[in-house]
Every structure is written in structure tokens, then in C-alpha cells.
């Protein structure tokens, strides 16, 4: 029994190592984003390269992904805020035959502001240097180069910081530290 437990632990560690190695060997920050052929919910074909010239937030998600549902309203809010500077592509890794469920998911989870696409797979996460976890987000500059990526759900402060950088906006100024009053010493 101990042998089986040790082997299971080693297999888990090996799987994690292989996943990390695969991410390291895939697209890295500064690399050109890989090609990605997509379809919108009406079936029209699109390519990621069609969006060169404008920064893109490429978010991979699925209808079965609970963290994806939780982050959808935040992504939609940020798309509305940055609509003139950044395009959000919400790319489902679900099979294309579940388009009605995809549309219902977007509506239910308040993702209406997002440009929704299909045609990606879990392998696409690897191609973009993401861990095999959902959701996964890639930040691509106007020249089509990857500038950042996040495996897992995004938190508001982290997303806002990355979007300011991607949109070329200055970040918040550090709060100046209050000066300590000079100590008076009586001699």
C-alpha cells in the first residue's frame, strides 16, 4: 500500500513538472502571439491576427468552469471601461456544438460586453504559455506580442494594473510617506 501511495505522489509531481516545462517551452512574454483561428457565435471566421493594431485581452474559459463564471462580470466591466483602448476576446474552449449554452452562459454571467468566440481548445492554453487550468488570460500588445499572462481567475486590482499597462496609461502614483516630525531632545 505504501508503494502505491508513493507512486501516485511521484506521478502527480511528474505531471506538474511536465506541465510547467511545457509552459516554459511555449510562447513567452515578448514573443509574437501564436495564430488562433476562431468563430463568433454566428459562425463567422476570425483570426487573432485580424486584431493587430489594438491591444487584446484573450480570455480562455468554458461553461463548466466555476472561476470563469465568477470573473465574467469583471471582464465585461473592464471591456466597457477600456472599450476605446483594448479589445477583450472571451474565447470558449467548449465544443462548438454547444453555442446555445455558450450564449446563455454569457448572458447569465453578465459577459454581454465581451466579444465571444469559439474554436479554441485546451491545447490553446499551452500554445499561449498558460498552465492547463481555467480560466487563462493572455495580454497582447498592439503589435501582436504577448506582454503578460495569467493562469487562473483574475482579481480586480491585478487586472486593472495589467490593463493600464497594456493601454499605455500611467499607473497610480505611490502614496507619499508622511515625514516624521523632528524629535526634540532637551539637554
What are these regions (language model features)?
Residues 47-66:
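Short active-site neighborhood of thiol/selenol oxidoreductases, capturing the structured segment around
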Amino acid at each position: 500500500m505504501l508503494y502505491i501511495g508513493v507512486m501516485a505522489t511521484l506521478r502527480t509531481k511528474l505531471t506538474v513538472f511536465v506541465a510547467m516545462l511545457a509552459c516554459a517551452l511555449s510562447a513567452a512574454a515578448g514573443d509574437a502571439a501564436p495564430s488562433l483561428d476562431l468563430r463568433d457565435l454566428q459562425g463567422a471566421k476570425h483570426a487573432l491576427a485580424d486584431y493587430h493594431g489594438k491591444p487584446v485581452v484573450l480570455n480562455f474559459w468554458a461553461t463548466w468552469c466555476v472561476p470563469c463564471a465568477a470573473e465574467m462580470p469583471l471582464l465585461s466591466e473592464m471591456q466597457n471601461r477600456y472599450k476605446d483602448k483594448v479589445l477583450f476576446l472571451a474565447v470558449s474552449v467548449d465544443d462548438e456544438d454547444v453555442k446555445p449554452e455558450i450564449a446563455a452562459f454569457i448572458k447569465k454571467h453578465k459577459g454581454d460586453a465581451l466579444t465571444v468566440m469559439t474554436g479554441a481548445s485546451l491545447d490553446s492554453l499551452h500554445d499561449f504559455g498558460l498552465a492547463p487550468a481555467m480560466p487563462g488570460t493572455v495580454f497582447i500588445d498592439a503589435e501582436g506580442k504577448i506582454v503578460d499572462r495569467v493562469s487562473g481567475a483574475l482579481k480586480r486590482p491585478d487586472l486593472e494594473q495589467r490593463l493600464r499597462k497594456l493601454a499605455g496609461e500611467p499607473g497610480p502614483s505611490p502614496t507619499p510617506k508622511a515625514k516624521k516630525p523632528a524629535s526634540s531632545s532637551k539637554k
